[in-house]
Regions:
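Short, surface-exposed amphipathic charged segments that create phosphate/polyanion-binding patches used
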Residues: 161-171
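Alpha-helical substrate-recognition element adjacent to the catalytic core
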Residues: 1-162
């Protein structure tokens, strides 16, 4: 007879980020850095889906359309010099709800020290899944307490058509 009735012993806790771990939106430090009024940005984002539908774009993902608007700000020069390094730095300005990030390691520690959980080799893992900017989350004080972060990446350089010659990147 099997000594362990559990075939999976890791408990994965999946967290959203904005308004779950922090009281507002992670983009606020970005707006402050570039002196952009956040309310104006979000009002524009809210109006984008209807505007794009009128242009024939029916399948606009409402949760991530703000990313296209960030790119519009980059192209227009309003977010001049935006980089992953800067996003990570700005992530350090994010303020978390009281008790965070301390709650993450406290839960892991509680489970690890509890003999009942130890008997079955039960462990807790914390993951963040967000439509936010991954580099900002990685720069925040909660990142070191997570087991994985899935979020949107800002691709700084786009490779031109034909960048692969014979299956290898060309320098």
């Amino acid at each position: 007879m099997a000594s362990n009735i559990f075939t999976q012993t890791n408990i994965a806790v999946i967290w959203d980020f904005d308004k779950t771990l922090i009281p507002g939106y992670m983009q606020e430090p970005l707006f402050r850095h570039y002196n952009v009024e956040g309310r104006t940005f979000w009002r524009e984002v809210k109006a984008l889906p209807e505007h794009l539908r009128r242009e024939g774009h029916e399948m606009v993902a409402v949760d991530s359309i703000y990313l296209n608007h960030i790119l519009a700000y980059v192209r227009s020069g309003l977010f001049k010099g935006l980089s992953n390094r800067l996003l990570r730095e700005l992530g350090g300005e994010l303020e978390f709800y009281p008790g965070l990030p301390e709650f993450f390691p406290a839960v892991k520690d509680h489970v690890a020290k509890n003999p009942l959980f130890g008997k079955y080799d039960i462990k807790v893992e914390h993951y963040i899944v967000s439509t936010g900017l991954r580099q900002m989350i990685l720069g925040s004080k909660i990142a070191e307490h997570t087991d994985g972060i899935w979020a949107c990446e800002f691709v700084e350089c786009r490779l031109p058509p034909g960048y692969l010659k014979e299956g290898k990147p060309q320098s």
